Amino acid sequence: MMISKKYTLWALNPLLLTMMAPAVAQQTDDETFVVSANRSNRTVAEMAQTTWVIENAELEQQIQGGKELKDALAQLIPGLDVSSRSRTNYGMNVRGRPLVVLVDGVRLNSSRTDSRQLDSIDPFNIDRIEVISGATSLYGGGSTGGLINIVTKKGQPETIMEFEAGTKSGFSSSKDHDERIAGAVSGGNEHISGRLSVAYQKFGGWFDGNGDATLLDNTQTGLQYSDRLDIMGTGTLNIDESRQLQLITQYYKSQGDDDYGLNLGKGFSAIRGTSTPFVSNGLNSDRIPGTERHLISLQYSDSAFLGQELVGQVYYRDESLRFYPFPTVNANKQVTAFSSSQQDTDQYGMKLTLNSKPMDGWQITWGLDADHERFTSNQMFFDLAQASASGGLNNKKIYTTGRYPSYDITNLAAFLQSGYDINNLFTLNGGVRYQYTENKIDDFIGYAQQRQIAAGKATSADAIPGGSVDYDNFLFNAGLLMHITERQQAWLNFSQGVELPDPGKYYGRGIYGAAVNGHLPLTKSVNVSDSKLEGVKVDSYELGWRFTGNNLRTQIAAYYSISDKSVVANKDLTISVVDDKRRIYGVEGAVDYLIPDTDWSTGVNFNVLKTESKVNGTWQKYDVKTASPSKATAYIGWAPDPWSLRVQSTTSFDVSDAQGYKVDGYTTVDLLGSYQLPVGTLSFSIENLFDRDYTTVWGQRAPLYYSPGYGPASLYDYKGRGRTFGLNYSVLF
């Protein structure tokens, strides 16, 4: 394996540390890794902000050890919350606030706040992951907590073939097994190269630490009994020494396997609390939950464009998100409808970035961004009698209605970023981004009224008028970087991010009168023109320090973020931007140590934080449905050639709020290992080594959202997986 000469700050795994030890001493201190996510070709050592780079070797160690992508990232990224262990990454914040996820610079976040950005790519196709902690406006709104940029594998000039196959099981049942297989071929020459890959994974049943089947998540949808397919192609054309074209295409599909579902008991008795929900076969549904995406991106770069470095990108992506069938329940705990939503997004856009150095010590980055998004949705209703008799397994469509108003969003933005070396010790950074947003909302018949029409209880209804509304945001950042030594930096940073409101959540609401000759008249509705949305700004401050030595590498930052507004949908069908002060403060960091002259290494990473809101002039603990718990991970590794062994732990700590609600913490321990064969590598793992029985963070939050209105808390008690054994073989030739 070739060792990169680029010097980076990461949470090193023991195998990588051992491999790197001889090379590190030979590297010069300025051989640092260029982070593409910052759009300014700055290295980690030049960043006045907490920055992490997860290299391929350490990610592979987790994935080939059986970890899901969300689990691996939570283990390796200090500021990222623990995994939901579900299809969703809902509630997985960075530093307690939402994050933006990109694939090769293309945003996966949409205006709707559906959280499946990490259900978007098979890890087999990932080269590295770049993380910027704290608020940033580099890629538009939404990244008030941080940014994760997934950089995909690209073709190489020489012919390379990759193959990987693995399985894992807890041996609790004949259904308790997952399998994965993946292959890729890449090649070319110095002028043109490409890579084509196919990765497939099949998930079976999951069982908790007591050997009981874990419940399927019928709120955000789970991964049990599902399949995942990721087909990706990349191509690179080197036009000449300075110009390059790069093409990326992807088809991704992850959905249930059409057979297993959540049995809610005959007559939906589990919702009334008179029976226990369980997972069973026999699912026969006209809508299967899952995620389907297409992505295509074309990037042009020119390192000698009028004395500047130019990067231009155009892209298109679409996604279809389908959710698990869910009941509508009245005040008497009777199920009045059983339905499933589908939400579709089409987005295209462009990015233009130019980097220049007008004089020694002065760097300027500027550019333009533009994108357009179209959102549509529908709700499929099933025959209630059949669904009830089968416990929610036999779901035959009877009609489909709209779910939210359709809308178009256009964003236009310009940004300017500058860095100036005051002297050999200090670098001053600063920048501004201006973003203009226009929302166009379609006319929309109320959701309940559409149901009445579809059920034959009415013949027509007035439409809630749509309309157009726009708003803009100026976002600023400034930082001072101190170069203490060539291997040590400290920084003070201020940056702003913005939370863009979800139009589907606020518009399309109205009050209707009684039917007149079958027609439902609209008496009052949200007026789009008079209900202007606006972004909610977050101010983020941090003081940080990093050291990158031969054996010791560490990065630590104290941070504080505050927002003072939120968007509220009022009962009188108006929308208000109200005072709502929320602050989050904490410390994020990582320490990795390679014990000299041994095969041993050890390390920890952590994010200790507190979230508070201001109520009647007093700061109080924030709602546990949103507040992130503190987290810590640790590992110890031993890597005598050709072995590599790692024991690691992940701890999510207790968090409580002013109302007395609490999310309990837990600790899990994993054993990961590998053995280098004459051809290929055999990896093995034991996840949840001590078979801990626990409820995930999402499993503790979900009852606060859905119970008792949609059934007892036990219906939403999503457990973590018990002890699970994994075996994987990979080869590169």
Curated annotation (Swiss-Prot):
GO terms for molecular function: siderophore uptake transmembrane transporter activity; signaling receptor activity. Its main location: membrane. Residues 158-733 form the TBDR beta-barrel domain. Residues 43-153 form the TBDR plug domain. CDD domains: ligand_gated_channel. Residues 1-25 form the signal peptide. Induction: Under iron starvation. It comes from the Bacteria. InterPro entries: Plug_dom (IPR012910), Plug_dom_sf (IPR037066), TonB-dep_rcpt-like (IPR039426), TonB-dep_rcpt_b-brl (IPR000531), TonB_box_CS (IPR010916), TonB_rcpt_b-brl_sf (IPR036942), TonB_rcpt_CS (IPR010917), TonB_sidphr_rcpt (IPR010105). A motif (TonB box) lies at residues 31-38. A motif (TonB C-terminal box) lies at residues 716-733. It is a multi-pass membrane protein. It is found in: Cell outer membrane. Receptor for aerobactin. Belongs to the TonB-dependent receptor family. This is Ferric aerobactin receptor. The lineage of its organism: Bacteria, Pseudomonadati, Pseudomonadota, Gammaproteobacteria, Enterobacterales.
